[in-house]
Amino acid sequence: MAGPAHWAEARDLGAVGDGRFLNTAVLNRGILELSRSGGGTLHFSPGVYRTGTLWLKTGVTLYLESGATILGSTELADYPETPPPRPTGRLEFGRYALISAVGQQDVGIAGRGRIDGQGSNPNFSKKALIARGWSPVDAYLKRPYGLSFVQCRGVSVRDVTLADLGFWCEDYLDCENVSVQGVNVDSWKPDWNNDGIDVDGCRNVRVSNCSFRAGDDAICLKASYRDCEDVTVTNCTASSLANGIKLGTASNGGFRNIAISNVALDGVQESGITIEIVDGGTLDGVTVQNIAMRNVTAAVFIRLGDMARSWTTGAGRPGIGVLRNVSISDIVAELSPRGNLSTGGSITGLPGHPVENVSISNVRMALRGAFPRGARIDPRSVPEAGANYPEHSMFGPLPAYGLFVRHVRGLALHNVVFSGGGGDGRPAVILDDAGRVDVDGLRPDSMVVLP
């Protein structure tokens, strides 16, 4: 079926691009034959190819020409369950997916075409499924991901558009040598759980020149059961119904050598930059620089918590983790707070478990406060909330309009400027149980240090 160059045309295999014919069997047979012949490219000429789950195999790339669409079926029965990877547990992966690869090597998706999950169909709505009698857990888990790569080596996704997916848009779990380049994700849904991209416990990953419109976290790194390390994210744009750039929450593993740069965020309902360890892992060595934010609720949220979830079977309850060595620089943020949550950001650890060595430099935050003029909040009234799910809004209104810092050892604030705040009576910065603090160029210089 494939010529000497191992190139196969989907239509030549019997695929029909009319948007009605179900191509699942034809396309999976072609993928399998290509892989068995040593690998190659399955080419999609312009047309709309309706399908259920496609199982991507070693050595195979799907190439979608401009005008070609892989259209996900709206029938849940067309998405068989993917066997869980090892280690087993409550891992987040594509149990059901439009395109799935498990334990494969040198796989890819490319071209200027489109992958459309038809996620707006009621069959993919949690609310609609629960109304039909589904349990909340099944309504959450049994919707199909867009792309799901599990324990793969050598993954390339480039130039395609991922639109209207039923669940997470693209997920990479325990993969190595991953390149995601020039991908446009457009899945802005109010049903939540439409993350733009999730990179969980992967090594050597580069995400570049991508755009994300996501109904949940836009760019999300996780470490459910192993470290996420050697990851770069650069030259991307994002909007989100949740967080813009996020590390966490799943974190039995940790984060090492993570570099995020040159990202423009416009329209983020939670925090622009969110960095979390709440499941016992270690975050050590994260750099975030050159980030522009507009219409973002909060700029920075750094949290060491104690949700203490175990993501693998038999792992036991994890202890409190470690969050240290974070550098955030060259940030311009125009904040549009929701309700009375008018604060630029927060950095919080737990008693006896501080966040360590955070540097924030060359930052400009313009705040438009909705806080009552002249109002103040007692800093001692802010709850610890160690076991709560971490979001910038978890503490309620904060006593500082710029930055609230608690349980931190090693903090550098250099050339940090807040504008538009201060009329509500709160100071710009509050330090509570903070040691080894170096402040230079803070404006306005209204900082309260609690004993």
Q: What kind of region is each of these model predictions?
A:
Residues 1-451:
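Extracellular/periplasmic carbohydrate-active domains that bind, remodel
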